[in-house]
């Protein structure tokens, strides 16, 4: 057969000579190999390959695959890996728009061959001893996006589908020594129209590549159908096997052992169902796996292969419109997870997966959706072992073919109901199911993501139902085309508002409801999660959701200033792009948890555990209130010394002195034990830096006057209300240049007990825009190196604080490394905060303590002002000023989280400009 370049633009050509998809089992030659998990029947081809990158097919080395071709001009590339992360081609992130939008006028299934980069790979090898004399196949676990394969100068095959294995038989072409494999990988093909996921657009062999041998008889496919009877103690095991090769007279035996190693069954595989008593059901709380070992013998009784596989017995079904696992309603406390590493992109390894699993386990996450493609097989093993429920999603997304600038316009949607696309999308469903069918963790098959709806996706569902009735089928896209409601077994939506979900659940629906995506965690987000979790406690048919998403997608690179920074869309010179819209993780790109994670952990805990934490917090807060009140009441008073100057009113007390400046509109100096704390006089605070969610809903535009007011407030004068040895009280009045205008005042009371009380008041006015916040702000003269506070742990906001644990906490002032800097570091319900300066050895040299007066306050201490943060596009752009910006607030806007492109924060977490706001606190001197 002669390979054709026009296959790239033909959706009916997606697999040429590709072997049938099969289960992800590993064959070992002996029981000893199986015990050691090292197979002599496999030979990895990972490592350095010869490589040439070409900008288009016309520029590629067209004959490099010929036997004896001179490859001396080739460079090298690492496999697994993407071309783009290794310096070949253009890094590009885009969400909905196709990468060629505005550059090539294309319609499905066209490909612009003048803009289709090609990677030419070559690898030379000798066969390992364990593979010689047998049939030899090659497995590409993931190649993006289309590949042609040659072996020793002979064309072998062609394949698409970036995220499931493509395997080929090399037996007619392979030699014991001196082999050369050649692969052409094309970045774009007709598959690009249905692989339009919201991610960086890569190409290359980014998952492992290996050879495997088939003995004379081979276990080509296994399906260990592990069910559970209604009594939840009787397991039902039906092995279905496919043998390949010389099958006459062969035998297969099965040995099944429990977690303690006791044999539950040992005997021949006949195709009959095996009943097993005393089985422990598999679930999130009890992820019990049983070890199956299949032994294949030839007609002479010689062991040909041994296949181990861990299986879980469980029963997943729809009962009265509710999804049930082992007879009990299941609630998905889930997250969407892209495969990601900030150095290697989607070419992740076991360390990445183990780290992600540890995060899921530590934060009460019980489910994961493989958005929007099947993951590496190891991830499924980890989910089996750790009881993580899975929605396994087909590699299908085509939102660029029907979403046009926010409008639904499916005139050239693919796959739709187009017959030429049907086989390729059903093949993608088949490849996923066949590989992953043995995994207990997979409860639901998903037809893909955001691809509208039509006959072709319906055919995928029909395949899933016919092939595997033990699982349900998911697809969200029918919400846009209800004519194909039969595609999905459940009502699935993205970013629906709580009231919209409630409306559905009140309608007595036939199908249960899940959110396949919710809580869009872009930047500083995840506010209002309570509104969703509470639905699960009220409505049995609300069965949870999957946060968007697990990890920020960003890539380490060196910027134009020579600084190493996590780059996002546009940082690499690419257009079109969606900039930082890939930064939606509950962990950063380097795997560190974002501050919002404590609320994920709280809301994904059981109601009983949440109630217990609430009770502990309430008791600890009450004790802190009593302790602080008693400490204040026991403080001794010392006479104040007041000095009236021309511009300044000076006040001295025990261990402190300060100057109130008429011209400076506030305290110009505050010294405690000789240390100056104020860079400039405090001012009313009206602005916190915009978050991604703020920008998405247009809040900065609506509230822009407050940004100006935060910098250009009008000083209307100083009044000395009291000045004596027991008390000095000074008022500063400010006019606010909003439309309509408003006013605020700061009142400072120096108390003889050694404290400066600060009272800030904002006077609301009808028609004033919403505020980002209100309180007091000041910059310290020198840097604060540590803050210690009594209040809730971590970063908290009005709509995201329940996960905080009340106690004494500390941190180094810092700006959170969101892809785009934004407001961060807020601490709600604070009773006391201590700002510390330290020497090089970490010893505290000075400290300033802020305490509540009548009620707790919110505070933040950051190395940059709100304006500096607002102006930066990367954390490396923030200036180092040597100061710390402190805000003490009585009102602060929530961060929101329903989505990041239009929905405002929930109403209770707005700060009205028409209402009065105030905050009071003491600076203990």
Language-model segment annotations:
Residues 216-245, 595, 599-617, 629-647, ...:
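Surface beta-strand/loop "capping" patches
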Residues 2-19, 35-36, 50-54, 74, ...:
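Accessory beta-strand-rich segments of carbohydrate-active enzymes
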Residues 2-37, 193, 303-629:
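Extended substrate-binding grooves/exosites of carbohydrate-active enzymes
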Residues 172-178, 240-319:
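Extended acidic/polar, glycine-enriched regions
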Residues 150-156, 257-259, 326, 654, ...:
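Short strand-turn-strand beta-turns centered on an Asx-Gly dipeptide
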Residues 39-40, 120-126, 216-260, 293-295, ...:
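Mature extracytoplasmic enzyme cores
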Residues 207-223, 313-329, 625-634, 785-790:
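Low-complexity, Pro/Ser/Thr- and charge-rich linker/hinge segments at domain boundaries
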Residues 84-86, 92-94, 142, 187, ...:
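Beta-strand/loop-rich accessory regions of lumenal/periplasmic or secreted enzymes
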């Amino acid at each position: 057969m002669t390979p054709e370049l026009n296959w790239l633009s033909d959706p009916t050509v997606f697999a040429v000579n590709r072997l049938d998809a099969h289960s992800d089992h590993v064959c070992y030659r002996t029981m000893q190999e199986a015990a050691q998990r090292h197979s002599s029947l496999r030979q990895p081809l990972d490592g350095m390959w010869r490589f040439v990158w070409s900008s288009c097919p016309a520029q590629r080395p067209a004959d490099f695959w010929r036997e004896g071709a001179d490859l001396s001009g080739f460079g090298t590339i690492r496999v697994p890996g993407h071309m783009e992360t290794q310096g070949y081609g253009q890094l590009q992130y885009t969400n909905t728009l196709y990468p060629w939008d505005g550059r090539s006028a294309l319609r499905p299934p066209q490909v612009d061959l003048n803009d289709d980069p090609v990677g030419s790979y070559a690898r030379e090898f000798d066969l390992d001893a364990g593979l010689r004399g047998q049939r030899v196949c090659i497995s590409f676990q993931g190649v993006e996006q289309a590949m042609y394969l040659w072996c020793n100068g002979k064309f072998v095959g062609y394949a698409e589908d970036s995220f499931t294995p493509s395997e080929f038989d090399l037996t007619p072409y392979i030699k014991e020594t001196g082999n050369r494999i050649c692969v052409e990988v094309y970045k774009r093909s007709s598959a690009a129209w249905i692989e339009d996921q919201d991610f960086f657009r890569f190409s290359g062999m980014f998952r492992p590549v290996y050879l495997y041998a088939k003995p004379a008889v081979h276990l080509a496919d296994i399906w260990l159908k592990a069910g559970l009877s209604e009594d939840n103690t009787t397991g039902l095991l039906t092995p279905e096997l496919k043998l390949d090769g010389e099958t006459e007279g062969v035998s297969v035996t099965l040995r099944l052992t429990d977690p303690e190693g006791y044999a539950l069954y040992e005997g021949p595989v006949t195709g009959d169902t095996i009943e097993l008593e005393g089985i422990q059901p598999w679930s999130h709380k009890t992820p019990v796996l049983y070890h199956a070992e299949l032994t294949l013998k030839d007609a002479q009784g010689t062991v040909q292969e041994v296949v181990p596989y861990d299986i879980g017995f469980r029963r997943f079904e729809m009962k009265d419109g509710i999804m049930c696992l082992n007879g009990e309603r299941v609630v998905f406390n889930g997250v969407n997870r892209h495969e990601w590493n900030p150095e290697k992109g989607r070419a992740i390894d076991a360390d990445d997966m183990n780290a992600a699993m540890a995060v899921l386990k530590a934060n009460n996450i019980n489910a994961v959706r493989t958005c929007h493609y099947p993951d590496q097989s190891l991830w499924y093993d980890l989910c089996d072992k750790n009881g993580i429920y899975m929605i396994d999603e087909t590699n299908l997304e085509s939102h660029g073919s029907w979403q046009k600038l926010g409008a639904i316009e499916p005139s050239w949607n693919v796959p739709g109901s187009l017959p030429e696309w049907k086989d390729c999308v059903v093949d993608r469903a088949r490849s996923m199911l066949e590989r992953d069918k043995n995994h207990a963790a997979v409860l639901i098959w998903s037809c893909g993501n955001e691809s509208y709806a039509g006959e072709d996706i319906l055919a995928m569902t029909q395949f899933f139902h016919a092939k595997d009735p033990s699982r349900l089928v998911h697809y969200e896209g029918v919400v846009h085309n209800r004519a194909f409601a039969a595609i999905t077994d459940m009502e699935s939506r993205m970013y629906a508002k709580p009231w919209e979900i409630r409306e559905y659940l009140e309608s007595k629906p036939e199908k249960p409801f899940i959110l396949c995506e919710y809580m869009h965690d872009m930047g500083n987000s995840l506010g209002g999660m309570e509104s969703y979790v509470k639905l699960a406690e009220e409505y049995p048919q609300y069965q949870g959701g999957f946060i968007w998403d697990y990890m920020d997608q960003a890539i380490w690179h060196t910027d134009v200033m020579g600084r190493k920074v996590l780059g996002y869309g546009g940082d690499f010179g690419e257009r079109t792009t969606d900039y930082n819209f890939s930064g939606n993780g509950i962990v950063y790109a380097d795997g560190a948890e974002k501050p919002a994670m404590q609320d994920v952990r709280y809301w994904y805990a059981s109601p009983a555990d949440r109630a217990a934490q609430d009770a502990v917090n309430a008791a600890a807060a009450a004790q802190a209130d009593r302790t602080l009140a008693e400490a204040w009441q026991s403080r001794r008073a010392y006479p104040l010394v007041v000095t009236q100057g021309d511009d300044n009113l000076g006040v001295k007390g025990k261990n402190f002195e300060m100057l109130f400046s008429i011209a400076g509109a506030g305290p110009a100096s505050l010294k405690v034990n000789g240390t100056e704390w104020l860079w400039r006089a405090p001012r009313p605070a009206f602005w916190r830096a915009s978050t991604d969610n703020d920008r998405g809903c247009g809040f900065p535009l609506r509230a822009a006057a407050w940004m100006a007011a935060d910098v250009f407030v009008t000083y209307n004068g100083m009044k000395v209300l009291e000045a004596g040895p027991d008390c000095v009280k000074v008022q500063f009045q400010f006019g606010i240049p909003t439309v309509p205008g408003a006013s605020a005042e700061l009142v400072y009371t120096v108390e003889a007990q050694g404290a400066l009380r600060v009272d800030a008041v904002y006077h609301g006015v009808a028609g004033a825009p919403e505020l980002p916040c209100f309180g007091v702000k000041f910059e310290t003269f020198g840097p604060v190196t540590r803050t210690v506070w009594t209040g809730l742990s971590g970063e908290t906001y009005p709509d995201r604080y329940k996960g905080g644990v009340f106690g004494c906490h500390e941190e180094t002032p810092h700006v959170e490394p969101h892809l785009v800097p934004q407001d961060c570091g807020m601490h709600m319900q604070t009773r006391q905060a201590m700002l510390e300066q330290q020497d090089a050895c970490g010893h505290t040299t000075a400290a300033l303590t802020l305490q509540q007066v009548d009620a707790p306050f919110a505070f933040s201490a950051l190395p940059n002002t709100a304006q500096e943060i607002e102006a930066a596009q990367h954390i490396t752009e923030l200036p180092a000023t040597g100061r710390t910006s402190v805000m003490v607030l009585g009102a602060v806007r929530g961060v929101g989280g329903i989505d990041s492109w239009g929905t405002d924060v929930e109403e209770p977490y707005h700060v009205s400009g028409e209402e009065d706001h105030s905050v009071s606190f003491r600076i203990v001197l």
